[in-house]
């Protein structure tokens, strides 16, 4: 019984979250995409710099 109750509780909470959430506007979606892209580029550049430094120091 406890397993069934936990599943029903999860479904109930999921419905509530879906009811409250909304679809992002085009502008919001583009802003999130830009920020995510910039973050990926920054992480890539940092990794590239670290690999260059490691090659220079390690030989």
UniProtKB/Swiss-Prot annotation:
Primary role: Essential subunit of the Sec protein translocation channel SecYEG. Clamps together the 2 halves of SecY. May contact the channel plug during translocation.
TM ranges: 37-57
GO MF entry, a single one: protein transmembrane transporter activity
Quaternary state and interactors: Component of the Sec protein translocase complex. Heterotrimer consisting of SecY (alpha), SecG (beta) and SecE (gamma) subunits. The heterotrimers can form oligomers, although 1 heterotrimer is thought to be able to translocate proteins. Interacts with the ribosome. May interact with SecDF, and other proteins may be involved.
InterPro entries, per database record: Prot_translocase_SecE_dom_sf, Translocase_Sec61-g, Translocase_SecE/Sec61-g
Coiled coil: none
Descriptive protein name: Protein translocase subunit SecE
Organism of this sequence: Methanothermobacter thermautotrophicus (strain ATCC 29096 / DSM 1053 / JCM 10044 / NBRC 100330 / Delta H) (Methanobacterium thermoautotrophicum)
GO cellular component entries: plasma membrane
Pfam families assigned to the protein according to its UniProt record, in alphabetical order: SecE
Subcellular localization(s) per the UniProt record: Cell membrane
Membrane topology recorded in Swiss-Prot or TrEMBL: Single-pass membrane protein
GO terms (BP aspect): intracellular protein transmembrane transport; protein secretion; protein targeting
NCBIfam families for this protein: PRK09400.1-4, secE_euk_arch
Similarity annotation: Belongs to the SecE/SEC61-gamma family.
Keywords: Cell membrane, Membrane, Protein transport, Translocation, Transmembrane, Transmembrane helix, Transport
């Amino acid at each position: 019984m406890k397993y069934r109750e936990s599943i029903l509780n999860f479904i109930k909470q999921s419905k509530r979250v879906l009811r409250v959430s909304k679809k992002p506007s085009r502008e919001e979606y583009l802003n999130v995409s830009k920020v995510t892209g910039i973050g990926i580029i920054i992480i890539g550049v940092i990794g590239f710099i670290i690999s260059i430094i490691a090659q220079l120091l390690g030989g």
